[in-house]
């Protein structure tokens, strides 16, 4: 699926076709849509491939020849197995910053992307690519925090039940939650390293007015 958005006086607005200064959002793009991204928009093929690789870790990549930057970050997700069991995991999300566009590419929908589409970010402008990226990272870090609080709540609840009655189902649930914590801890450390590279690097121009937002993201990730 390919979607196109652009900010206007009314906020975040979906548009029918890509145009300069817009945000292109690709979720589980088909082969035809991938070709459109590479041939019509000009996104590097390896950037599209990396963004859709579930094993890809958080990092920053820059292509000097085409002046394109790829930022891969991990974002939290969950799968509700049944009423008592929830599985938490992380997925990669690619953000391509290039001439004329900012492009997000992922295999699955994410809370952060949906929040941007729904206009929940104040003062966002699709033409301001650095601010767009940092706002997305802020939403992702806030989602991590929400999930961590829920994991803590479920862990405490499960431990309390196990103290009263030891059972295999409860033990498996607790192990799954601990596994989720390990995933999240690893992903947050990787995202934090990527955030520091963004701040130190020259590939993404960090404007003075973006410094406060960058600091907000750092605080949330810590």
Give a label for each model feature.
Residues 1-220:
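Peripheral, non-transmembrane regulatory/ligand-interaction domains of membrane transport proteins
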